[in-house]
A protein has these predicted regions:
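A beta-strand edge to alpha-helix "cap/lid" segment located at domain peripheries
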Residues: 1-12, 74-152
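Short, low-complexity N-terminal intrinsically disordered segments enriched in polar/charged residues
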Residues: 1-42, 149-152
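Generic, low-specificity signal for short hydrophobic/alpha-helical stretches with a mild N-terminal bias
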Residues: 3-6, 18, 26, 51, ...
Length: 152
């Protein structure tokens, strides 16, 4: 690629990141399972400590493919208490300009503490291919009881 092509590719990727950043947040807040799934590739992988807290048969915390994601989003939407996430973000996100999109739901929100986590996504072909969610100390404390029930 020449310099102009690199600039265009970076601009296109930035547009994809902007779209995913806004649409993922809005669709998750609205519990829009089909809308969320449309942001993921058919064979996407999602890893989160919330997975075994929601799905008893997924104790490794890893979901593979849209059908497993669908089950998690549907059940998670049904079981999500209002206080779990306040959905406050600073509006800032990070990217390497090629494949990564990262943002934070910080613990300290304007109206008090919220679940603290970081969304880390690998984007391929305009879709989320690999999504990892890292939970902070406040969030881990909230889901710890559900996680311990699946421990040996």
């Amino acid at each position: 690629m020449n310099g102009r092509q690199n600039e265009q590719a970076a601009s296109d990727f930035h547009a994809v990141c902007t779209r995913v950043f806004h649409e993922w947040h809005e669709r998750a807040r609205a519990r829009d399972t089909e809308g969320l799934l449309a942001l993921y590739s058919e064979d996407a992988i999602l890893e989160s400590p919330l997975v075994p807290a929601i799905l008893d048969d997924k104790q490794d915390g890893v979901l593979r493919g849209r059908e497993e994601l669908r089950r998690f989003f549907e059940e998670g939407g049904r079981r999500r208490p209002n206080e779990l996430v306040r959905w406050y973000r600073t509006g800032e996100w990070l990217t390497d300009g090629r494949r990564l999109l990262v943002w934070e739901y910080p613990r300290q929100a304007p109206d008090g503490d919220q679940v603290d986590l970081v969304e880390f996504m690998e984007i391929a072909g305009g879709l989320i291919a690999y999504h990892r969610v890292y939970w902070g100390w406040k969030g881990r404390r909230l889901i710890a009881p559900a996680l311990s029930r699946g421990s040996p």
